Amino acid sequence: MTESVLDYMTRLGRAAREASRVLARASTAQKNRALQAAAAALDAARDELVRANELDLAGGRANGLDAAMLDRLALTPKVIDGMIEGLRQVATLPDPIGAIRDMRYMPSGIQVGKMRVPLGVVGIIYESRPNVTIDAASLCLKSGNATILRGGSEAIHSNQAIARCIQLGLAEAGLPAAAVQVVDTTDRAAVGALISMPDYVDVIVPRGGKGLIERISRDARVPVIKHLDGICHVYVDLAADVDKAIRIADNAKTQRFAPCNTMETLLVHQGIAEQVLPPLAAIYRDKGVELRGCPRTRALLGNEVLAASEEDWSTEYNAPILSIRMLDSLDEAIEHINRYGSQHTDAIVTENFTDARRFLTEVDSASVMINASTRFADGFEYGLGAEIGISTDKLHARGPVGLEGLTSEKYVVFGDGHVRT
């Protein structure tokens, strides 16, 4: 009899739970050996990876995937190099598991502290990019978590080929194959099953479009680490250094248009707008950025700026489009960001310490920056190494989620025959 999707996913979940107990007690050396061996297996399997990827690319073209999607799907030599290097980099990161902090004696004589431990089983749901398979598997493995990976159907052959390399690495290190499992079925019911198994899955991390993440957030029966939007702002304060403001606002928008930490709205104090906006508009024009502005912005810059609608202030474009608004005060800037933003990443450009401190305190975002581009909101730039994603939630992790974000803490208590009286 054919196994149902629910039975198949339950089998994966049960195996992952058992593997998670082995991983939780695995040594750092053992985990690093698995990562290094997986990197070597990827390097040796380049031809196999390319052949599998060609099947996915052919299927994508037949199904009408656009050029951008096909580009994200492709396993080029550069992408494969990046996956290999990513595994090796994660192997060099400090292992957070087992670290004990805040040990202190209580009046009763016991010692109390906190020990960092894995979450258990992490379910990853993602679209298109096969390299996410490596990113997610490596971080989960190093942090002592078993993982179940459900990639997009368009990348099924690539993900299976990558998974075989990871399995070789696990075997060489003496770790269970179920520590990293790739869902082999393309049936969408597998996603519904994965997010509905609290007995076997401890947390879900979705990576993909807003529709996917909204669905998972709505339907999941296990905790979700996610962000829905990247509506990031740069506010140019009255006390800003003009050169810094221009450099930061340029980089925050034009270094790359698609990432979630790209600026979507530029806020400028009206008292410095004449110095900042005209040169910035010329830069944006040369780089093909469409500008949409408030009435005062259009009065200053002219008809080349389209009229911004109310919807523009709350839109993540992921494209060469920028909204611009002139404001009268820092208060207005903070109110605008907290009203329209997505609590992802927001920056102020200012030489005024008091304004900077107010911005840090009152802007309710996962990353708040002073005199720096929003493009720095990234696990690598924060010294976390690789990241599994960025969270705009306040529980359990917030901001770029690296190794530590895939762990929890438990209290540990040391006594010497102590009893409570």
Swiss-Prot record:
Biological processes per GO annotation: L-proline biosynthetic process
What's in the keyword line of the UniProt record? Answer: Amino-acid biosynthesis, Cytoplasm, NADP, Oxidoreductase, Proline biosynthesis
Give GO terms: molecular function aspect only: glutamate-5-semialdehyde dehydrogenase activity; NADP binding
InterPro entries in the record:
Ald_DH/histidinol_DH, Ald_DH_C, Ald_DH_N, Aldehyde_DH_dom, Glu-5-SA_DH, GPR_dom
Pfam families in the record, alphabetically? Aldedh (PF00171)
List the catalytic activities from the record: L-glutamate 5-semialdehyde + phosphate + NADP(+) = L-glutamyl 5-phosphate + NADPH + H(+)
Pathway membership: Amino-acid biosynthesis; L-proline biosynthesis; L-glutamate 5-semialdehyde from L-glutamate: step 2/2
Which Gene Ontology cellular-component terms appear in the entry? cytoplasm
Entry EC no(s): 1.2.1.41
List the subcellular locations: Cytoplasm
Q: Does the keyword Acyltransferase apply?
A: no
- What's this protein's function? Catalyzes the NADPH-dependent reduction of L-glutamate 5-phosphate into L-glutamate 5-semialdehyde and phosphate. The product spontaneously undergoes cyclization to form 1-pyrroline-5-carboxylate.
**Family membership:** Belongs to the gamma-glutamyl phosphate reductase family.
What protein name applies here?
A: Gamma-glutamyl phosphate reductase
Taxonomic lineage per UniProt?
A: Bacteria, Pseudomonadati, Pseudomonadota, Gammaproteobacteria, Pseudomonadales
